[in-house]
Amino acid sequence: MFKLLVVVFAALFAAALAVPAPVARANPAPIPIASPEPAPQYYYGASPYAYSGGYYDSPYSYYG
């Protein structure tokens, strides 16, 4: 009986050594969410894009 326990313990120990330890994986980087075009009053100083009405007039409208 004792010999059986030793064999079972040795088999479990060998199996534990054979299986690689789990590696903690880092979380993937979050996908940035683009903000809409800010209101004209939030621009610093006079900007040519402050009162642009066209869709392609402002570089920020691409992300809207």
UniProtKB/Swiss-Prot annotation:
A single GO molecular function term of this UniProt record: neuropeptide hormone activity
Maturation propeptide residues: 19-40, 63-64
Compartment list: Secreted
Keywords noted in UniProt: Neuropeptide, Secreted, Signal
GO biological process, one term: neuropeptide signaling pathway
One Gene Ontology term, aspect cellular component: extracellular region
Signal sequence residues: 1-18
Name of the protein this chain belongs to: Neuropeptide-like 4
Organism name: Drosophila melanogaster
